């Protein structure tokens, strides 16, 4: 998992409340047994005018020119600004996968659905919670100033605006540790591989029959 310490990026405003996971990555794209390739179908039903299906060549699609991510001023955005209850709806880890694979490193919103919020941290995506008034101010400034960027300093837990103003945010210490060190669940487990090997060796010494393969 990619480490997250300080990130400066272009902001894209998703000016809708209650954006659900089916909007983030529609259900027809969940059939893949792979964990990659979801970025091209992020917000598929809003992003394109034609119906999308798995395996489709994105170059053959008809982009919706009115959708925020298709507007030239937001090309290359890596910070998504959203309204309240982002990521609601059914549980699907594909939602943070799609956002991450599109190129987003962080989301800023007043609130999130719990499962989406937890899944984001586990996949290297930082979901920042700010008060609605601060989020509204960021929306106003993003709309007013083309090329609007923010700097997110996870170590200091602040969002830094272009004028130097800062908005502080909270993040659980363990989640912060994992993001700064680029550790997902597998990475955390591998940090204890020596202890795991020692435990397995001791267990097999005490119960050698566990190593035998039963043949039926």
From Swiss-Prot:
Disulfide bonds: none annotated. CDD domains: IPMI_Swivel. It is an enzyme of class 4 (lyase). GO terms for cellular component: 3-isopropylmalate dehydratase complex. GO terms for molecular function: 3-isopropylmalate dehydratase activity. Its EC number is 4.2.1.33. InterPro entries: 3-IsopropMal_deHydase_ssu, Aconitase/3IPM_dehydase_swvl, AconitaseA/IPMdHydase_ssu_swvl, IPMI_Swivel, LeuD. Belongs to the LeuD family. LeuD type 1 subfamily. Catalyzes the isomerization between 2-isopropylmalate and 3-isopropylmalate, via the formation of 2-isopropylmaleate. This is 3-isopropylmalate dehydratase small subunit. It comes from Variovorax paradoxus (strain S110). The gene is leuD.
């Amino acid at each position: 998992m990619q480490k997250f310490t300080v990130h400066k990026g272009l902001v894209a405003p998703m000016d809708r409340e209650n954006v659900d996971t089916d909007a983030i990555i529609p259900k027809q794209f969940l059939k893949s047994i792979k964990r990659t390739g979801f970025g091209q179908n992020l917000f598929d039903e809003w992003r394109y005018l034609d119906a999308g299906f798995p395996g489709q060549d994105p170059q053959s699609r008809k982009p919706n020119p009115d959708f925020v991510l298709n507007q030239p001023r937001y090309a290359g955005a890596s910070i998504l600004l959203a309204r309240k209850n982002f990521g609601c709806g059914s549980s699907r880890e594909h939602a943070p996968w799609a956002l991450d694979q599109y190129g987003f490193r962080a989301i800023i919103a007043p609130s999130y659905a719990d499962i989406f919020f937890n899944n984001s941290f586990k996949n290297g995506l930082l979901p920042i919670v700010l008060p609605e008034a601060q989020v509204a101010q960021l929306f106003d400034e993003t709309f007013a100033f083309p090329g609007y960027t923010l700097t997110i300093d996870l170590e200091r837990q602040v969002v830094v605006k272009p004028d130097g103003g800062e908005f502080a945010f909270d993040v659980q210490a363990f989640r912060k540790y994992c993001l700064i060190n680029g550790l997902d669940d597998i990475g955390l487990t591998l940090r204890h591989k020596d202890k795991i090997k020692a435990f397995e060796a001791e267990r097999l010494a005490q119960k050698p029959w566990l190593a035998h393969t039963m043949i039926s």
